[in-house]
Amino acid sequence: MEVNVINIESQNIGKIDLNPLIFSVNYRPDILKMVVEWQLSKRRIGAHKTKTIGDVSGTTAKPYRQKHTGRARQGSLRSPQFRGGAVIFGPVVRTHAYSLNKKVRNLGLKVALSLKNSCNKLLILDSIDVNFVKTAQVLRFIKNFEHQSFLIIGKDYNKGMMYSCKNLHNVTLLKQIGTNVFDILRHDCVILTVDTVKYLEDRLL
């Protein structure tokens, strides 16, 4: 499958073959859901915690005598049934991350890239190494395409490209080693460099 390769001036400078095993995979929303949930679970801090009876401060004295009061026996005012007492079965500090099969993760990436390609929201750029710092130049480039947000993925980017995109809220730069399903789906248009296409073919095949 041949697609055009463009430069930062939005000019066609050649063509590149995209492997259909990566860029023309059947749409699988179930796989995308699994991978996105896996990614988001790894981002959670898991710092939530409530106090157990060992954490609650307060007296250790028995509230009242064991017998002959007509009330239920109690041994501590820090028990869960009292106001200001402990919380039973409350959240504890833990990690929410879990493992996901590598084949599923790779398939999710293929499905996400294929989805963008099928919607004509995938562009191939020759390079993102520029020798200037001009936000206006990048702005002119993205205005040629009717998309809301852009994810630019490259092997690496220099300071010129980084500072040119820094003030654009709808443009995100990402190194190819960090290519992931969540970022691809949350941006309207994905721009890959030629080096990134080769990297993804080596990584996913």
Curated annotation (Swiss-Prot):
Alphabetical keyword list: Ribonucleoprotein, Ribosomal protein, RNA-binding, rRNA-binding
GO molecular function: rRNA binding; structural constituent of ribosome
Annotated Gene3D superfamilies: 3.40.1370.10
UniProt entry tagged with the keyword rRNA-binding: yes
Signal sequence residues: none
GO process terms (BP): translation
Span list, region Disordered: 56-76
Source taxon at top rank: Bacteria
Gene Ontology CC: ribonucleoprotein complex; ribosome
UniProt cross-references to InterPro entries, sorted A to Z: Ribosomal_uL4, Ribosomal_uL4-like, Ribosomal_uL4_dom_sf
Subunit structure: Part of the 50S ribosomal subunit.
Family: Belongs to the universal ribosomal protein uL4 family.
Function: One of the primary rRNA binding proteins, this protein initially binds near the 5'-end of the 23S rRNA. It is important during the early stages of 50S assembly. It makes multiple contacts with different domains of the 23S rRNA in the assembled 50S subunit and ribosome. Forms part of the polypeptide exit tunnel.
Protein name: Large ribosomal subunit protein uL4
Native source species: Ehrlichia ruminantium (strain Welgevonden)
Gene: rplD
